[in-house]
C-alpha cells in the first residue's frame, strides 16, 4: 500500500469518527436537557417523554455509528489501496 494513501486513510478515519460524534453529541445533550425540563414541568408525562427521548437518542447515536463504520472500512477494507 502506498504510504501516502495509508496516511490519508488514517486521517480520514479519525475525521470521520470525530466529526460524526460532534453533531449527535450536541443533539443528545440538548434533547436530554429539554426532556429533563419537560419532566420537571409535567411529572405526569414522564413515561411519554422518556420513551420519546430514548427513541430520539437511538436515532442520533446511529449517526455516530455510521461514522465509525466508515472509519473501520477506511482502516481495514480500504477501497483506495
Curated annotation (Swiss-Prot):
InterPro entries documented for this protein: ATP_synth_csu_bac/chlpt, ATP_synth_F0_csu, ATP_synth_F0_csu_DDCD_BS, ATP_synth_F0_csu_sf, ATPase_proteolipid_c-like_dom, F/V-ATP_Csub_sf
Subcellular location, record wording: Cellular thylakoid membrane
Membrane-traversing stretches: 6-26, 57-77
Keywords: ATP synthesis, CF(0), Hydrogen ion transport, Ion transport, Lipid-binding, Membrane, Thylakoid, Transmembrane, Transmembrane helix, Transport
Site (Reversibly protonated during proton transport): 61
GO molecular function: lipid binding; proton-transporting ATP synthase activity, rotational mechanism
Membrane topology field: Multi-pass membrane protein
Gene3D superfamilies named in the record: F1F0 ATP synthase subunit C (1.20.20.10)
GO CC annotations, alphabetized: plasma membrane-derived thylakoid membrane; proton-transporting ATP synthase complex; proton-transporting two-sector ATPase complex, proton-transporting domain
Organism domain of life: Bacteria
A Pfam family that the UniProt record links to this protein: ATP-synt_C
Membership in a protein family: Belongs to the ATPase C chain family.
Quaternary assembly: F-type ATPases have 2 components, F(1) - the catalytic core - and F(0) - the membrane proton channel. F(1) has five subunits: alpha(3), beta(3), gamma(1), delta(1), epsilon(1). F(0) has four main subunits: a(1), b(1), b'(1) and c(10-14). The alpha and beta chains form an alternating ring which encloses part of the gamma chain. F(1) is attached to F(0) by a central stalk formed by the gamma and epsilon chains, while a peripheral stalk is formed by the delta, b and b' chains.
Protein name as annotated: ATP synthase subunit c
Source organism of the structure: Rippkaea orientalis (strain PCC 8801 / RF-1)
Taxonomy of the source species: Bacteria, Bacillati, Cyanobacteriota, Cyanophyceae, Oscillatoriophycideae
Amino acid at each position: 500500500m502506498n504510504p501516502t494513501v495509508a496516511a490519508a486513510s488514517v486521517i480520514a478515519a479519525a475525521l470521520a469518527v470525530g466529526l460524526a460524534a460532534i453533531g449527535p453529541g450536541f443533539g443528545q445533550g440538548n434533547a436530554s436537557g429539554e426532556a429533563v425540563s419537560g419532566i420537571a414541568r409535567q411529572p405526569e408525562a414522564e413515561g411519554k417523554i422518556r420513551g420519546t427521548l430514548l427513541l430520539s437518542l437511538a436515532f442520533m447515536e446511529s449517526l455516530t455509528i455510521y461514522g465509525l463504520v466508515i472509519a473501520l472500512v477506511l482502516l481495514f477494507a480500504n477501497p483506495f489501496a
